[in-house]
Amino acid sequence: MTPIFFNQQYPTLVDICARWQLVYDANATFELRFESDTLSLHKRDEPKLDGIVVDFVTGAVAHRRKFGGGRGQSIAKAVGLKQGVMPSVVDGTAGLGRDAFVLASLGCTVTMVERHPVVAALLEDGLRRAYQDAEIGDWMRERMRLFHGSSLEALSKLAQEVDVVYLDPMYPHRDKSALVKKEMRVFQSLVGADLDADGLLAPALALATKRVVVKRPDYAEDLDGVKPNTVIETKKNRFDVYVKAAMK
């Protein structure tokens, strides 16, 4: 059971916390709120910080879907997306679902795996609103779903054939931008660093039929010390690609 603070007078919050086995704690560091049909996470000792929400419909994520470069984006190249090839993807470290959403918006079917119940609750709420949206709801229902569980367990238990496993383990950020600082400070204090991240590569390679893609900061070492087959570099990050078979 994960401790959380929330207004116990709100039936919606009571239901959400019961569903995700979140237990009320008056002294908890984090608070969940449900306002304007949106679930948000707040760090109680930093009240000036905005709440963290999962929003696939508006804001930066929607802007990237419309103007972000389509299949020319590095992440699309990394997973092998090309004309006539729409890989199925397991995102083993879903976080706020942004990379998963980019891949789904480009045509991939994506299963997001998230082990932390608070983050999973935020993802589910974001999916609920996206599924209801007139513009993106139809394809969101077809292409994006959530699997709550330990990444390691989930990757080994997912029975269906998966083309690509995508991993973006939590890594200490040097970036000083306000957004990264805010979200990473809140996120890392909520979920902690991915101390078992190296243990993800082997089950990911066992599950993926075509390739495993690992997103890393440009200064990070190779995951589990294993050299990738190819590397796609961006301004601040890189995608390490471990190829098992050709994309067809």
From Swiss-Prot:
List the Gene Ontology MF annotations in alphabetical order: rRNA (guanine-N2-)-methyltransferase activity
Keywords for the protein's UniProt record, in alphabetical order: Cytoplasm, Methyltransferase, rRNA processing, S-adenosyl-L-methionine, Transferase
Query: Which residues does the annotation say bind S-adenosyl-L-methionine?
Result: R98, D99, E114, R115, S150, S151, D168
Compartments where located: Cytoplasm
Q: Which reaction does it catalyse?
A: guanosine(1516) in 16S rRNA + S-adenosyl-L-methionine = N(2)-methylguanosine(1516) in 16S rRNA + S-adenosyl-L-homocysteine + H(+)
* Statement: the UniProt record of this protein carries the keyword S-adenosyl-L-methionine: yes
Report the principal subcellular site.
cytoplasm
Q: Does the keyword Nucleus apply?
A: no
User: What's the Enzyme Commission number for this chain?
Assistant: 2.1.1.242
Q: What class of enzyme is it?
A: transferase
Q: Which InterPro entries match?
A: 16SrRNA_methylTrfase_J, SAM-dependent_MTases_sf
What Gene Ontology cellular-component terms does the record carry?
cytoplasm
Task of the protein? Specifically methylates the guanosine in position 1516 of 16S rRNA.
Question: Of which family is this protein a member?
Answer: Belongs to the methyltransferase superfamily. RsmJ family.
The name this protein carries in UniProt is Ribosomal RNA small subunit methyltransferase J
Gene, per the UniProt record? rsmJ
